[in-house]
Amino acid sequence: MSVADIKKSEIVAQFQRAQGDTGSPEVQVALLTARINELTGHFKEHMKDHHSRRGLLRMVSRRRKLLDYLKGRNPDSYRALIEKLGLRK
């Protein structure tokens, strides 16, 4: 397993609702947040990488939509997830 696979399985294990859950909004948001954080570090070094920046903006938009869905469906889970990931100041 690569480092990315190990990190991904740790994130899934931490945020899954039940054993084997990989598709819940909580897991998807956590995985997107990890990828967004990695790309943010990438842009500190490669400021002119606009091709990847477009992908980053797409990921941020997708995370926002998932968070909106979760907020409407399960506000308690939304608040817990935001707190755990440290997304809101």
Curated annotation (Swiss-Prot):
Keyword Metal-binding: no
GO MF, one example: rRNA binding
SMART domains assigned to the protein according to its UniProt record, in alphabetical order: Ribosomal_S15
GO CC, one annotated term: cytosolic small ribosomal subunit
Pfam families on file: Ribosomal_S15
A biological-process GO annotation: translation
Keywords associated with the record: Ribonucleoprotein, Ribosomal protein, RNA-binding, rRNA-binding
InterPro entries membership: Ribosomal_uS15, Ribosomal_uS15_bac-type, uS15_NS1_RNA-bd_sf
HAMAP family: Ribosomal_uS15_B
Family statement drawn from the similarity comment of this UniProt entry: Belongs to the universal ribosomal protein uS15 family.
Cited function: One of the primary rRNA binding proteins, it binds directly to 16S rRNA where it helps nucleate assembly of the platform of the 30S subunit by binding and bridging several RNA helices of the 16S rRNA. Forms an intersubunit bridge (bridge B4) with the 23S rRNA of the 50S subunit in the ribosome.
Binding partners and assembly: Part of the 30S ribosomal subunit. Forms a bridge to the 50S subunit in the 70S ribosome, contacting the 23S rRNA.
Protein's recorded name: Small ribosomal subunit protein uS15
Organism per entry: Bordetella pertussis (strain Tohama I / ATCC BAA-589 / NCTC 13251)
Taxonomic placement: Bacteria, Pseudomonadati, Pseudomonadota, Betaproteobacteria, Burkholderiales
